[in-house]
Swiss-Prot record:
Belongs to the deoxyhypusine synthase family. The gene is DHS1. The keyword Transport does not apply. NAD(+) binds at residues 107-111, 133-135, 139, 240, 287, 312-313, 346-347. This is Deoxyhypusine synthase. Its EC number is 2.5.1.46. InterPro entries: Deoxyhypusine_synthase (IPR002773), Deoxyhypusine_synthase_sf (IPR036982), DHS-like_NAD/FAD-binding_dom (IPR029035). GO terms for cellular component: cytoplasm. It catalyses: [eIF5A protein]-L-lysine + spermidine = [eIF5A protein]-deoxyhypusine + propane-1,3-diamine. Pathway: Protein modification; eIF5A hypusination. It comes from Senecio vernalis (Spring groundsel). Expressed in shoot tips.
Amino acid sequence: MEESMKQASVMENLRSVVFKESESLEGTCAKIRGYDFNNGIDYSQILKSMVSTGFQASNLGDAIETVNQMLDWRLSHEQVTEDCSQEEKNPTYRESIKCKIFLGFTSNLISSGVRDIIRYLVQHHMVDVIVTTTGGIEEDLIKCLADTFKGEFSLPGAELRSKGLNRIGNLLVPNDNYCKFEDWIIPIFDQMLEEQKAKNVLWTPSKLIMRLGKEINNESSYLYWAYKNDIPVFCPGLTDGSLGDMLYFHTFRNPGLIVDVVQDIRAINSEAVHANPRKTGMIILGGGLPKHHICNANMMRNGADYAVFINTAQEFDGSDSGARPDEAVSWGKIRGSAKSVKVHCDATIAFPLLVAETFAAKREQSAEPSS
């Protein structure tokens, strides 16, 4: 009898540990459900189902929702404050004020087919400020002069070098492409130097980039559309790439060209500081310089209101590339009240899907005739 009571006590203790009573999640958390293909193939609904799928699919779904919030926001959604200007009290004006979107990306994405998606966004003026690396400038221009090809990640470097082929992941860029780039760009540098001397033009990286977008005059180029739509493109590391090589070569041929980075740091910080009364949103593909430059500019206004990071970097080495949005909150680069998410995914996979369900979907909806 005593042994039986002991067994019952043990079982009761085990049950209390193993079957601990749960706090109800009904109404507070989304239920995990995937897409049901019995409903047919509906790509928009498949993307909408990501948010309830789990893991990085849910992060992608959250990113889609965050970008749509950026695109939907209007000043009219906010309460009128006592200290706002008369113009800001006007309902028509308030409805016209949209979120200011900063787009950042690394050069490899311009080497890839994501270039065409970025060109689409810039062509239709869907973003307001761009930050990229030098490769993100030169690769766009070079693709107007010659093609990039699909290769393999495993191709041996020594063999490729002997053939004059450069590998970017599983992409191949013939070395001849850079020769064509040199032939195209050096005369432009000559013209810029002449204008510097004759007209006292003080070039900055963003002014130089705008000039290159004008000179390339090619609708496949996102820089061309940035020039056409007056969207600033910032590149603080302008010398770190083939473009830097060309500037270096130009110093031997025709020395004296000056490019001032100080004007540009004032310009990009001003883009954030003077954004008010607009909210600001950040969409950053990859890490490094573009990620930090955009975040740091938004720190000047006490943080961005929306943030979407898409990259595969980890935070455990303390790198800015791998840092989650919450780390940026600690620096004041993202507001504590902001809607933010990081998608741990190759941007060549995630970004086209995100654009399809945000920017492109809204543009398509606006083009549909009203019934």
